Amino acid sequence: MLNRSDQPRILEPEQLVVQRPERIKLPNGVPLSVLNAGDNEVTRIDLLMAGGRWQQKQPLQALFTNRMLREGTRRYDAARIAEKLDYYGAWLELSSASEYAYVTLYSLNKYLPQTLDVLESIVKEPVF
């Protein structure tokens, strides 16, 4: 049985390696940070857009606007978005903070083109 009254030993890490992202500016002027971390066959794409709580005119406006992105686009209704992401083993996280709204896509590398199509539609063609 574990004795919870005994404090565990504190171990200092031998070496802490912090990987720096590669910073690129796309032809359209959008900054891109690329971090190749690990051998996993998963890609994470984070989109940061100005539009957090500091820019909202009504309480919760930034949060609800961001969350509505998955509710439908010109090409896909909410059920089709969920179905396509689920089929390809991908998922979305939608959130907002003080300054920014975040859209994060996790996708298996082999299905990235298909899931990027859904992400593009969500960001460029929302219907709410």
List the model feature ranges, each with a label.
Residues L2, D86-F128:
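Acidic/histidine-enriched segments that form metal/cofactor-coordinating
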Residues M1-E83, Y88, T104-S107, D117:
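His/Glu-rich zincin catalytic helix
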